[in-house]
Amino acid sequence: MNKSSILLYHGVTKEKNSVGIENCSGKHMDADVFEQQMKYISENKNVITLRELVRLIEADEPCPPDCVAVTFDDSFKNIRTVALPILKKYNVPATFFITTAMVGNNRLFWVDRLEHTINRTDKKLLCLEGKYYTLRTSTDKIDTLTKVKRMLKSERPSKRNTVLK
């Protein structure tokens, strides 16, 4: 079997200037970089759908040389408004994993709400479940975001919502 790659994205943005720690995890790629990547793979790789890649693997058939599939997790609006036109321009198929609970509303994912809340707070100290987190600098905020996100990932949604209020 030939090697294959799956390129996973979350979002694509035209926003050049983040504020504070927004997008500190790099979840949203710059549109110009994304376009360069799609142009490159469309000209230099065999781009197939994830469905076709799975079918080949399950059938124990060889993948085309330099085989690539493109996927998007989550359901950010910028996938439709920014990424999709670029994908169409280069005729790159993609698989979209949509978080259905987010469709049709303007709520943020809990991790994005957490990032936004920590980024926008004027507080210098956060006490959460008996632990103290410093929020004086962007570095402090990123460190706090990482630690609190790790802690909340294993919690029930109701607990996350309580913490985020």
Regions found by a protein language model. Name each.
Residues 71, 75-84:
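Membrane-embedded segments
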Residues 26-62:
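C-terminal domain-boundary segment and adjacent tail
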Residues 107-165:
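Extended, charge-rich helix/loop segments that form flexible
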Residues 11-14, 53-55, 75-77, 101-104:
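Short, solvent-exposed loop/turn segments at secondary-structure junctions
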Residues 82-100:
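A short alpha/beta connector and helix-capping loop motif
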Residues 14-29:
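Acidic/histidine-rich helix-loop elements
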Residues 7, 41, 73, 87, ...:
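Conserved, mostly hydrophobic/aromatic
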Residues 4-6, 67-69, 93-95:
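Structural preference for beta-strand elements that scaffold enzyme active sites
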